[in-house]
Amino acid sequence: MGSSRLPAKVLADIGGRPVLAHVLERAKLIDSDAILVLAIPSAASDDPLVEIGVAAGATIVRGSTDDVLDRYHQAARQTAADAVVRITGDCPLLDPAVSALVVDRFRTGDLDYASNVHPPTYPDGYDTEIISSAALAAAWREAVDPYEREHVTPFIWRRPDRFRSANVADAVDRSSWRLTLDTAEDLLQIRKLHHRLRQRGTFGLAEIVDLRQTIA
C-alpha cells in the first residue's frame, strides 16, 4: 500500500475489481496444487487487503513492513511449503503460463532458485521467482543488508557459487514493455488493455502481442 508514486495502487480499480484481486486470481492459476498466500504488512493501512485475500482463497500472513524476507520465510513455515513462488502485487496482467515455465524449470533442475529476471526478457510485470524453502531460510538467517531483507531474493542470486540458479528466457526480448503498475500512466494503459482483451478471459502474453501487432 505504501507506493510513493501511486499510493494504494493495489486497490485501484480495473474492470470493476481491485488490482490485487486480479493478481491473486492469476497467481492461483500458476499451479492448481499450490497454496495461495497473501503476505502483507501488519500495518493498519494494509487491513483492507485482508478481505480481498480471503475472498480469493488466500492464506493471510502478516509481518514487518520493511523486512519482506521475514514475511516470505514465515509464509513458507506456516504453510510447510518446500518452495515459494514470488509474485508482487503490482502485476495485474501477470501471465500464469509464463510463471508456470519458471516453476517447471525449478522443479526439473534440482535448483535453489529460478526466475525470468536474470536477465529479463519478458515484459516488466511478468516477473516470477521461485525459491526453495531451504534457501529462503538461509537468506532469512544470514542476510543483514537492508536491501536483501526488503527485496527477498538478492541474498540468493548474488551468491551463484552457493545457490543453484536458473533463468527462463523468451525467444523474443520484450523486457522494455511496461505491463506493471507503478504510475498513473501505467494504470491507464493497463485499464485500456484489460478493456480490449477481457472478453478472452485470463488473457496472457500471446493475446497482448497479437493486440499490439493489430494496432501497429
Residue spans for each PLM region:
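N-terminal glycine-rich phosphate-binding loop and ensuing alpha1 helix
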Residues: 1-40
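Acidic helix N-cap motif at the loop->helix transition within catalytic regions
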Residues: 45-52
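Conserved donor nucleotide-binding strand/loop of the catalytic core
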Residues: 54-67
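Conserved donor-nucleotide/metal-binding helix-loop-beta segment in metal-dependent transferases, i.e.
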Residues: 95-121
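Conserved nucleotide-sugar donor-binding
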Residues: 81, 128-140, 184-186
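Short aromatic/hydrophobic "clamp" motif used to bind/position activated sugar donors
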Residues: 84-85
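Acidic donor-binding/catalytic loop of UDP-sugar-dependent glycosyltransferases
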Residues: 68-73, 88-105
